[in-house]
Amino acid sequence: KLVVLPIIGSLNHTHFWEGPCRAGHREDMTPEAEKAAFDRIFAAEQARLKDMAPEIEVLPAIDARYCEDFITPQSVFDQIDAQINRVDVLLPMGWRTPKLERYDKTFVVLQNGNEGIDFSAYCRSLGREAYVCMDRKDLDALLHLLWVRKVVRSTRALVLTAGAQPTFGIQSLIRDPEILRKRYGMEIIKMPFTSIFD
């Protein structure tokens, strides 16, 4: 399975007057109102990930709230670190999560906005693999492709020969199976056919 870890970010202000880029009624901008609003958003974002294809395993989402200092709490990174070794894809949703790019994983940003595109471009500039999906349809298609790649990478082909290098196609003629390993991660094991009779 392709293991996906959703990380749902949110900027929650410490006082109603914080944040020059927001406006509204005081009662809607208090820390309590913002917390309640993000609680609803967090639940809705998790619901978007229900009923994924059977080859996709979605781990419980991580609540990545931070305040106007734009520092992700260490507790968020501790939650990620506890499961990062089994994760194939980090799935940032909602607001960006500062310093998430520290992880050398594939990023698939589920957000239809400029922040997702900007974060993806930033990750790519650091050499990370990163994509943006604007909706569930995009997400399903991309995760399926990443799952196929994972399956191919974990595939081992046994090629039995009479000692000569086998050909792998009529037109393509891939003479060097090492190309398949380097490009796709697929391991090719070549051995004489007589060895299976020992």
Give the predicted meaning of each segment.
Residues K1-D198:
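An N-terminal assembly and electron-transfer interface module characteristic of large anaerobic redox
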